[in-house]
Amino acid sequence: MIFGSILLAFGSAAIATILGTTGAVGAFYSKKRVRNTLSVLNQVPVVNADVVTGFSICILIVVVFGVSKDTYIPLAAGHVVLSAPFVYLAVVPKLKQMDPSLYEAALDLGATPAYALFKVIIPQIASGILSGFVMAVTLSLDDYFVATYTKPATFDTISTYVVNATKGSQTQIKTALWALSTIIFIIVIVVEL
């Protein structure tokens, strides 16, 4: 369960980081109308309730596209859809801080657009990409609703396991979760000092 959740978090975060970064760079270098449209479309998963996102992903992938829910495809797609807008939102401010003349200078000096992208733009926005990746991992580990609607029946993420364990009368698990919560709370307080 823990290994599967971590693998899901890092895998979906990697895909979300690629999609979010690509979308942010593409929107940044697009015309204003396209940029504004992409920005508005990016906000839909952010302001939408996770329950609606999870249910919609389940309906779209399982019912419309006919992908079996026993695979991990709906779960991974749900986590990517949930996380990619946050990566986009982390990368866009770094693009606005960047000096656009450096990219143009690289092109004037004979660099191909792809070479200039990887050698000029990506290093300047690397901190935004990294923060977006960390946010995507955190969202994936924390998510309950999207995982509930899209996960296979035989798989539990950490969040679904914890919520399901606290619903029943499993007092040993509840006690262990309370102890774990106390330890995490103390660690957070110590780190903040």
Task: Give, region by region, the residue ranges found by the protein language model.
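Transmembrane-helix boundary motif in ABC transporter permease subunits
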Residues: F10-N42, I59-V63, L117, L193
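Hydrophobic alpha-helical elements at and bordering transmembrane segments
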Residues: M1-I2, I6, A27, L38-V44, ...
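Hydrophobic alpha-helical transmembrane segments of multipass integral membrane proteins
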Residues: F3, L7-L19, G23, A49, ...
